[in-house]
């Protein structure tokens, strides 16, 4: 049989029918949930195109915020052979092994009081192990060297504005060509949990730019809309990679957006309870940070509402796949309680989410509702087929693609 080599890079959308986008939300240790989903999708692509198939071979853009930004870097950074540094199947084990070291849990007497005092005087974790780990894995690889286009948001605490690290922008703004390590550390620097990150970038002419960054979730916890915006800007700018696609041609966009779970179904708080809260309760309550959780969830949901409405209005609902779990409870809804038991629960949540029906947000209630009889698992199997076909079409049409191989 004949099969396209999975080692050939993805040819630009101008040679295909679709613009393919993968987006991964922020959420700390809850990144385990999309890690499971991504592992399943990649395994389905491997069934179609061989064991060397990787997600970066199929998506024009991979966007990620916070923990999703770290996953994005891991999926797109090249190894010595010029292939993705991590297979998607390896990310789940990475979380299970490394999260307890990134977010060490104190089980000694009075640990709760100790954590409270520490959270009021500085970040809950010093981030040293996380920084060492990211530098060890990603090295000096720069944004311009990723194997497909990436979009990773951060927030500049000095200028109080978002700073978006985008493969598209770096072509014209070399002072944004930071290392993936610095970008991943920055987008993960969640206020109250991890320290802000400072670094400098210098170009070949000796010009320098300083960055003072915190978690990208402050700006866009769900980066799907950012990714679409970056592509739209490229199309509007006349990029040959996208001709003849039009900026508003959402029927040509294929978006997979992965959430990291939330506790909406738990209905954890109510107005009567929080009416008497002061600054302390909003910042730390029952192993959570309610004010930060509220902003992050609102940010993610607004993007989901917008994209659901737009794709529905353009009769392209099938082109927008949002996989999210609203049923987390207790410690599972936290971003940092990295006990073995809790991490196992999150991994199982990812497995169970695959078996759940495909859901879409109800634009009136804001809740996810079952939209089809098919499951997320079957939707991903179908998506793998579409992605594989799209890649093959581009390889056939492009004069730059490697010749197909026979096996």
UniProtKB/Swiss-Prot annotation:
**Residues recorded as bearing Phosphoserine in the entry:** 398
The record's keywords, sorted A to Z, are:
Cytoplasm, Hydrolase, Lipid degradation, Lipid metabolism, Phosphoprotein, Plant defense
Active site positions, chain numbering:
66 (nucleophile), 215 (proton acceptor)
Q: What happens when the gene is disrupted?
A: No visible phenotype under normal growth conditions, but leaves of mutant plants contain decreased levels of lysophosphatidylcholine (LPC) and lysophosphatidylethanolamine(LPE), but increased levels of free linolenic acid, jasmonic acid and methyl jasmonate, as well as the oxylipin-biosynthetic intermediates 13-hydroperoxylinolenic acid and 12-oxophytodienoic acid.
Motif GXSXG: list the residue ranges: 64-68
Q: Which SUPFAM superfamilies match?
A: FabD/lysophospholipase-like (SSF52151)
Instruction: Give the induction note.
Output: By infection with the fungal pathogens B.cinerea and A.brassicicola, and avirulent and virulent strains of P.syringae pv tomato DC3000 (at protein level). Induced by ethylene and copper.
Q: Where is this motif: DGA/G?
A: 215-217
Where does the PNPLA domain lie? 22-228
Mention one GO biological process in which this protein takes part, according to its record: cellular response to hypoxia
Q: Which CDD domains match?
A: Pat17_isozyme_like
A single GO cellular-component term from the record reads:
cytoplasm
Motif (GXGXXG) spans which residues?
A: 26-31
> Where is it expressed, tissue-wise?
Expressed specifically in roots.
Q: Which GO terms describe its molecular function?
A: identical protein binding; lipase activity
List its EC numbers.
Answer: 3.1.1.-
Major localization listed first in the record, in broad terms? cytoplasm
State the compartments where it is located: Cytoplasm
Q: Domain annotation text?
A: The nitrogen atoms of the two glycine residues in the GGXR motif define the oxyanion hole, and stabilize the oxyanion that forms during the nucleophilic attack by the catalytic serine during substrate cleavage.
| Role of this protein | Possesses non-specific lipolytic acyl hydrolase (LAH) activity. Catalyzes the hydrolysis of the galactolipids monogalactosyldiacylglycerol (MGDG) and digalactosyldiacylglycerol (DGDG), and less efficiently the phoshpolipids phosphatidylcholine (PC), phosphatidylethanolamine (PE), phosphatidylglycerol (PG), phosphatidic acid (PA), phosphatidylserine (PS) and phosphatidylinositol (PI). Favors the release of fatty acid at the sn-1 position for PC or PE and the sn-2 position for PG, PA, PS and PI.
Q: Which family does it belong to?
A: Belongs to the patatin family.
| PANTHER family per record | PATATIN-LIKE PROTEIN 2 (PTHR32176:SF109), XYLOSE ISOMERASE (PTHR32176)
Q: What is this protein called?
A: Patatin-like protein 2
Organism of origin is: Arabidopsis thaliana (Mouse-ear cress)
Q: Which gene encodes it?
A: PLP2
């Amino acid at each position: 049989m004949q099969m396209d080599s999975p080692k050939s890079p993805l040819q630009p959308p101008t040679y295909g029918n679709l613009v393919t986008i993968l987006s991964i939300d922020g959420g700390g240790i809850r990144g385990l949930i999309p890690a499971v989903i991504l592992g399943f999708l990649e395994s389905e692509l491997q069934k179609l195109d061989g064991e060397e198939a990787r997600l970066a071979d199929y998506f024009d853009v991979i966007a990620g915020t916070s923990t999703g930004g770290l996953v994005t870097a891991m999926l797109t950074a090249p190894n010595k052979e010029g292939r993705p540094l991590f297979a998607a199947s390896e990310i789940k084990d990475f979380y299970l092994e490394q999260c307890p070291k990134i977010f060490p849990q104190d089980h000694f007497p009075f640990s709760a009081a100790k954590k409270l005092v520490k959270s009021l005087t500085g970040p809950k974790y010093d981030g040293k192990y996380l920084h060492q780990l990211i530098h060890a894995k990603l090295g000096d690889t720069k944004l311009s060297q990723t194997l497909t286009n990436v979009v990773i948001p951060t927030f500049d605490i000095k200028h109080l504005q978002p700073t978006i690290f985008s493969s598209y922008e770096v072509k014209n703004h070399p002072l944004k060509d930071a290392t993936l390590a610095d970008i991943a550390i920055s987008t993960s620097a969640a206020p109250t949990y991890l320290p802000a990150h400072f670094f400098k970038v210098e170009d070949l002419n000796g010009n320098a730019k300083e960055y003072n960054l915190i978690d990208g979730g402050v700006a866009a916890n769900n980066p799907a809309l950012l990714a679409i915006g970056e592509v739209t800007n490229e199309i509007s700018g006349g990029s040959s990679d996208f001709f003849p696609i039009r900026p508003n041609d959402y029927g040509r966009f294929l978006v997979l957006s992965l959430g990291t779970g939330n506790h909406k179904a738990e209905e954890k708080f109510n107005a009567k309870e929080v009416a008497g809260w002061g600054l302390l309760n909003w910042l730390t309550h029952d192993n959570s940070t309610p004010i930060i959780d509220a902003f992050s969830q609102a940010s993610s949901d607004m993007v989901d509402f917008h994209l659901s409405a737009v794709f529905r209005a353009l009769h392209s609902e099938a082109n927008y796949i949002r996989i999210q779990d609203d049923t987390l409870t207790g410690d599972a809804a936290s971003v940092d309680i990295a006990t073995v038991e809790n991490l196992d629960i999150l991994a199982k949540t990812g497995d169970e989410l695959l078996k759940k029906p495909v859901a879409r947000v109800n634009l009136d209630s804001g809740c996810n509702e079952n939209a089809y009889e098919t499951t997320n698992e079957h939707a991903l199997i179908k998506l793998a087929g579409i992605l594989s076909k799209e890649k093959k079409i581009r390889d056939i049409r492009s004069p730059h693609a490697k010749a197909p191989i026979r096996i």
